[in-house]
């Protein structure tokens, strides 16, 4: 199968469509994470459908002092990856094609959710992201659009935009793809020197420490519910402060203040890893660590039940990285 490169919306609209059209939006510099999105899109579209991959480095998403000029542009390599993963079309428009009158005067506002976490550190970023996603949805006219869960706040905002503005497109989130050592795949990973990459592992390690802490608490609560309300049950509950879900989380569990549980314990376990990474050379410089409700990205309270996202952003050298994992908090016993 040969992937077709298109540069204009007119070329894309002229294609005869059969079945569903699935779109994967990227800024290029494709890697295995993008390939996973494309393969998933191929499964959704089916043999009779069409998979379109957009490649567009959107200037509206980059703030002053960010890495627009050095963001990698590797279209030839991107075409090969997209073709191998099953894309029918790579749509790589110019800035003039997407913004024919220059930067748009009217933009889509991300609202309060877009001002939290990433939005607090990158003012205007989500407005620019939603504006180009909205334009690309209009230009590509898909039945379904797929986005990686690594950018959890972006995914949540796109879902909200599609719902609030009646875009009539199904939005699908695809799980984060990681290297063998846990580092989330990102186009920006190529900026990292070897020593910076070792420090960058602290992002995923912090998330895993929080996840393991949470799993240990849930396991002990489940065990305690099975024990009669006697001294044995009390001992099982009090053991939370010294238990661990895995051997490599034991030091974190020991360091967590006595009596800390629930979301507070998850935050504490993750933060301990990040604080240790801040003492490395080169150091990890934390932007934020949040344990949030994915519906609005506000911090969850200690009595929270339901789905949550543990998210982190940090800089190593000149490279800024983000990561997150989902967690589920059950009803208290």
Curated annotation (Swiss-Prot):
Give residues annotated as binding beta-alanine: 61
Query: What one GO molecular function would you report for this record?
Result: ATP binding
According to its UniProt record, this protein's enzyme class is ligase
Active site: residue positions = 34
Query: Which pathway does it serve?
Result: Cofactor biosynthesis; (R)-pantothenate biosynthesis; (R)-pantothenate from (R)-pantoate and beta-alanine: step 1/1
Q: What are the binding positions for (R)-pantoate in this chain?
A: 61, 154
Stored NCBIfam families:
panC
What name has this protein been given in UniProt?
Answer: Pantothenate synthetase
The taxonomy runs: Bacteria, Bacillati, Actinomycetota, Actinomycetes, Kitasatosporales
Q: Which gene encodes it?
A: panC
């Amino acid at each position: 199968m040969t992937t077709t490169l298109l540069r204009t919306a007119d070329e894309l609209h002229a294609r005869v469509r059969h079945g569903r059209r699935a779109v994967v939006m990227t800024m290029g510099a494709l890697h295995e994470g993008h390939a996973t999105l494309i393969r998933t899109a191929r499964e959704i579209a089916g043999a009779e459908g069409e998979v379109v991959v957009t490649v567009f480095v959107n200037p509206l998403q980059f703030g002053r002092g960010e890495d627009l000029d050095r963001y990698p542009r590797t279209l030839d390599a991107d075409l090969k990856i997209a073709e191998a993963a099953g894309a029918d079309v790579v749509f790589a428009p110019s800035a003039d094609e997407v913004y024919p009158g220059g930067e748009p005067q009217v933009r889509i506002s991300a609202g309060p959710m877009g001002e939290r976490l990433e939005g607090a550190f990158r003012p205007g970023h989500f407005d620019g992201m939603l504006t180009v996603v909205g334009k690309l949805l209009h230009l590509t006219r898909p039945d379904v659009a797929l986005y990686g869960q690594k950018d959890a706040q972006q995914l949540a905002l796109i879902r909200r935009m599609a719902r609030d503005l009646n875009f009539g497109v199904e939005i699908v989130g695809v799980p984060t793809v990681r290297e063998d050592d846990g580092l989330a795949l990102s186009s920006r990973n190529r900026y990292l020197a070897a020593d910076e990459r070792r420090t960058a592992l602290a992002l995923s390690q912090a998330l895993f420490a929080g996840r393991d802490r949470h799993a240990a608490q849930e396991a002990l609560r489940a065990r305690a519910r099975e024990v009669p309300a006697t001294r044995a049950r009390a001992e099982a509950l009090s053991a939370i402060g010294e238990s661990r879900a895995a051997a490599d989380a034991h030091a974190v569990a020991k360091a967590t203040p006595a009596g800390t549980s629930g979301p507070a314990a998850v935050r504490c376990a993750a933060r301990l890893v990040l604080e240790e990474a801040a003492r490395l050379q080169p150091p990890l410089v934390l932007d934020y660590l949040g344990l949030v409700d994915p519906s609005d990205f506000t911090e969850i309270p200690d009595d929270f039940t339901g789905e949550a996202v543990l998210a982190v952003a940090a800089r190593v050298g000149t490279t800024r990285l983000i990561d997150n994992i989902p967690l589920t908090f059950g009803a208290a016993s």
